[in-house]
Amino acid sequence: MKRIAIRVVPAAALLALGLAWMSRRVAGQATGQPSTKNGEWPMYTADLKGSKYSPLDQINASNFSKMEVAWRFKTDNLGPRPENKLEGTPIMVKGMVYATAGTRRSVIALNPKTGELKWVYNMDEGERATRWAPRQLSGRGLSYWTDGRGDERIVYVTTGYRLVELNAKTGQPIASFGQNGIVDLKVGVVIGKDKQIDLEKGEIGLHS
C-alpha cells in the first residue's frame, strides 16, 4: 500500500500542476500558431484536438511505393548505451524537426531536408536517470511553445523527472524558467506526513 501511495498521490499533484501550467501556456498562444496545413507537425498528436491528421495529399496510394529514404540520423552515441527502439514522435515546426533521442533522452534539432544536426541538448543526471528511473530511453517526445511574438521554446521531461525549457533556435535552457531552465518535478512531492520523497530513488507518476 505504501508503494501505491508514492505513485498515485504525486501523480495527482503533478496533473494539477501540469494543467495549470498548460492553461497559462495555451492562453499565450492566441496568434501565430504553427499548423499541419503548411506541411508541418507541430504537436505530438498534430494539434490540440489530437486529430493525428495531416491534410497533405502529395503522398497517396498511387505513389507510396516509389518513396525513397532521404536521409538517416543515428542516435547510438546519445547516451551510455545504444537504444534498441524509438517510440517518440518527432515534431516539425517552422522548418525544423525536433525529437528526443538516445538513452540519455537528448533533444535534437535537425534540418528536415538534409538531416543535418543543428543543435543537441542533454543532461547527465547520473544514477537518478540510469539506475532508478522507471521510464528511461528517449521517451514519447516533446512539445513546442511560442508566444506568437518570437519567443519559441521546446519543452520536455528528462528520464530523471526534470521539466526543461529550451530555446527552440539555439537549444539553450531558458534562464527565466525554473532554475536556469529546469524544474525538478520531485521537489515538493511528499509521502506520508510531509516527508519529501528521495530525490534520487523516489518514483513519481507522470502523464501527458
Regions found by a protein language model. Give the residues of each.
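Aromatic (tryptophan-biased) beta-strands that constitute blades/sheets of beta-rich domains
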Residues: 29-80, 116-131, 172-199
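Signal peptide processing junction and immediate N-terminal pro/mature segment
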Residues: 20-30
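Bacterial N-terminal signal peptides
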Residues: 10-20
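Bacterial N-terminal signal peptides that target proteins for export
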Residues: 1-12
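Repeat-blade elements of multi-bladed beta-propeller folds
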Residues: 41-45, 83-102, 106, 133-163, ...
